[in-house]
């Protein structure tokens, strides 16, 4: 049985070794790039509006029209959703390693192409930018199921949660780096090409050279991805895929002996036995009986979490303006506005985002996934209500810092909570031959939530007073009521967490049921399953 395969037992009981940390860095740099690319757009959207939608007759600086802003902010999420489903499925069909390099090269190419977006009109530039950001998102989407699955299948069961969490925690550094790069670029351009505030000189407040600033910020994301490509190609296929899906226990033992200091004996007959028993398909009656409620729990929790998380993260600049933590747009030049938005996001990343990720790394294998996720949803709800109920108090002079502190705590408990655990758990609780697919489905549900948040929040957060809305937007429900809605999403996630099993300290095969006999599964020749081609020797 799978639980008795020596190659898998050796992986579960292996001491933490140098290659584990190497794998964390290789997989983590993908997530560093993912976070940088997905969140860097929020740093430059105000600048894009000033450059391409400038109206000299307007008292306010140019801003992206509602449909354009929604597309620029949300199109990468649409690509990510599609990529999660496609590459998740492909990772179970072709193997984790074969697909892993494809996603990274797609990210590198589209990162560079995003910064080279062109057109004879504003619409042309935005259309080109959206095209490349969709395919950038497609590559990013593949990184979610593949990185999580690869790390879970390499790790030992004692520290598996920390290893997967460490990969995901690189997102925090991606966010931070995005802010730092934007600060450096905007400061450098501002010092070289200084400009007056918009209200003092509407045309001169946006210097022509500012068109290079946003391009540099977007293109920088290609560098860490490119540096990681070689090492991804050197990684061997995971032993769990090779033994349980490709049915080659000998190759699995050989691969793991090369990279981990463990003695492994091949057991082809036991691997064949697992293949004969574990043949039920995705969404079959047996799958739904074993894992249906688990998949429902992971998808719903990730969906509602990302509505709250991404709507808040993408639109930090709007929230900061609403509480007057950022000056009014017409009192700043274009590059000064970019600098101050980037500085604010960097501060939140440094104080709220990164600590939350690493608290998860340190505590997840001590207190478990369930407690962290449940507690995270609870405290996110509490802090969002703490922002929403006395919202008018936070907008009065002298109370803005308190708002930012409370806002940072919501990010802390998102990352020391469901933002991390919703990524980790789907990589642990499903069978090896469906693991990448199920993680992709769960992650795609999350990105559907991100799309709802990124598109919906643009409209919902608009003032209820039509005279105070951004140009082109109808009146919304306001930031205060939007925060109430996001708190409600967290409440839903709290209750659906009870559908997700605790995976701390258990082997992947114990969690997925692959080490259990099941009378409902008919005996069949090992060659009857043609759904996955055996992986060739590395």
UniProtKB/Swiss-Prot annotation:
One record GO biological process: phosphate ion transport
Pfam families: Sugar_tr
Biased composition (Acidic residues): 511-522
GO cellular component: membrane
Parts of the chain on the Extracellular side: 45-69, 120-123, 185-210, 316-346, 391-396, 462-481
Signal peptide: none
Record carries keyword Iron: no
Transmembrane segments: 24-44, 70-90, 99-119, 124-144, 164-184, 211-231, 295-315, 347-367, 370-390, 397-417, 441-461, 482-502
InterPro entries: MFS_dom, MFS_sugar_transport-like, MFS_trans_sf, Phos_permease
Tissue expression from the record: Expressed at low levels in roots.
SUPFAM superfamilies: MFS general substrate transporter (SSF103473)
Membrane-topology annotation of the record: Multi-pass membrane protein
Cytoplasmic topological intervals: 1-23, 91-98, 145-163, 232-294, 368-369, 418-440, 503-538
Keywords: Membrane, Phosphate transport, Symport, Transmembrane, Transmembrane helix, Transport
Induction remark: In roots by phosphate starvation.
Annotated localization: Membrane
Gene Ontology molecular function: any one: symporter activity
Chain intervals for the UniProt region annotation (Disordered): 507-538
Family the entry assigns: Belongs to the major facilitator superfamily. Phosphate:H(+) symporter (TC 2.A.1.9) family.
General function of this protein: High-affinity transporter for external inorganic phosphate.
Family matches, as NCBIfam families: 2A0109
Further remarks about this protein from its record: Although related to the sugar transporter family, it does not transport sugars.
Protein name: Probable inorganic phosphate transporter 1-4
UniProt lineage: Eukaryota, Viridiplantae, Streptophyta, Embryophyta, Tracheophyta
Name of the gene: PHT1-4
């Amino acid at each position: 049985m799978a639980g008795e395969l020596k190659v898998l037992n050796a992986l579960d009981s292996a001491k933490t070794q140098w290659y584990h940390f190497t794998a964390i860095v290789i997989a983590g740099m993908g997530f560093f790039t993912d976070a940088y690319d997905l969140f860097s757009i929020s740093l430059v959207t105000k600048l894009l509006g000033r450059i391409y939608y400038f109206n000299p007759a307007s008292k306010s600086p140019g801003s992206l029209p509602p449909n354009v802003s929604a597309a620029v902010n949300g199109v990468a999420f649409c690509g990510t959703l599609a990529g999660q489903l496609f590459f998740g499925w492909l990772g179970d069909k072709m193997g984790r390693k074969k697909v892993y390099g494809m996603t990274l090269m797609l990210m590198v190419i589209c990162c560079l192409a995003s910064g080279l977006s062109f057109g004879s009109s504003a619409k042309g530039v935005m259309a080109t930018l959206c095209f490349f950001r969709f395919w950038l998102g497609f590559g990013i989407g593949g990184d979610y199921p593949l990185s999580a699955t690869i790390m879970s299948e390499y790790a030992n069961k004692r520290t598996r949660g920390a290893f997967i969490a460490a990969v995901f925690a690189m997102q925090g550094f991606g966010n931070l780096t995005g802010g730092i790069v934007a600060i450096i670029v905007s400061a450098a351009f501002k010092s070289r090409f200084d400009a007056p505030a918009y209200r003092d000189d509407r045309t001169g407040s946006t210097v022509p050279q500012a068109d290079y600033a946003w391009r540099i910020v977007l293109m920088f994301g290609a560098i860490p991805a490119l540096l990681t490509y070689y090492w991804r190609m050197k990684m061997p296929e995971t032993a769990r895929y090779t033994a349980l899906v490709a049915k080659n226990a000998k190759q699995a033992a050989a691969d793991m002996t090369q990279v981990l200091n463990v003695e492994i004996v091949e057991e082809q007959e036991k691997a064949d036995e697992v293949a004969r028993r574990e043949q039920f398909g995705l969404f079959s009656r047996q799958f739904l009986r074993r894992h249906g409620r688990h998949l429902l729990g992971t998808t719903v929790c990730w969906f509602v979490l990302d509505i709250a998380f991404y709507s808040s993260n993408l639109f930090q600049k709007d929230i900061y303006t609403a509480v007057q933590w950022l000056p009014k747009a017409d009192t700043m030049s274009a590059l000064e506005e970019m600098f101050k938005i980037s500085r604010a996001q960097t501060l939140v990343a440094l104080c709220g985002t990164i600590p939350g990720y690493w608290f998860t790394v340190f505590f997840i294998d001590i207190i478990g996934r369930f407690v962290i996720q449940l507690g995270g949803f609870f405290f996110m709800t509490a802090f969002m209500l703490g922002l929403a109920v006395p919202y008018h108090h936070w907008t009065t002079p002298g109370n803005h810092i308190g708002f930012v502190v409370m806002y940072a705590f919501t990010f802390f408990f998102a990352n020391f909570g469901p933002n991390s655990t919703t990524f980790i758990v789907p990589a642990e609780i499903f069978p090896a031959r469906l693991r990448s697919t199920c993680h992709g489905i769960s992650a795609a549900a999350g990105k559907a939530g991100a799309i709802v948040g990124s598109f919906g929040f643009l409209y919902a957060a608009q003032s209820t007073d039509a005279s105070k809305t951004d140009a082109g937007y109808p009146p919304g429900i306001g930031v205060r009521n939007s925060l109430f809605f996001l708190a409600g999403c967290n409440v839903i996630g709290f209750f659906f967490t009870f559908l997700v099993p605790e995976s701390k300290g258990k082997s992947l095969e114990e969690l997925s049921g692959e080490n259990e006999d099941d009378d409902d599964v008919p005996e069949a020749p090992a060659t009857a399953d043609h759904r996955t081609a055996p992986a060739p020797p590395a």
